[in-house]
Amino acid sequence: MSEPTTAFAHYRVREGHVDEFLALVGKHGPILRRLGLVTDEPTRVYVGEDKPSGPLVIEIFEWTDQDAVSRAHTHPEVSQVWEAMGPLCEERDGRPSMEFPHLSRVDVS
């Protein structure tokens, strides 16, 4: 089993749809956790402006391992939430509607 990896999900949410989108994000983490796809590390969600163009939501969570990402992509309950998120987001300023960089924490001390 590989090490956990942290996802920094960037969602460029359509104007006027932030509350609806956040309701889906509120379901997302608990589903992933119940399915054993993410660690017990709390999911963090941030909302701001993707200046100058519109709302940006960032969701940070920790996959249990790299394989969890693949398993999530084939699970119908996860797919249902992801499919509902898609229409609420938009490409903006030449950037995709959603981006999912995965990073590993390093100790620099």
Q: What are these model-predicted stretches?
A:
Residues 5-12, 42-76:
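Short, well-ordered beta-strand segments in beta-rich or mixed alpha/beta enzyme
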Residues 28, 72-75, 102:
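Histidine-centered active-site/metal-ligand motif
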Residues 1, 13-14:
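Short, charged, low-hydrophobicity "junction" segments
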Residues 1-3, 39-58, 81-109:
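Glycine-rich beta-strand-turn "strand-cap" elements at beta-sheet edges
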Residues 17-43, 77, 81, 85:
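Short amphipathic alpha-helical segments
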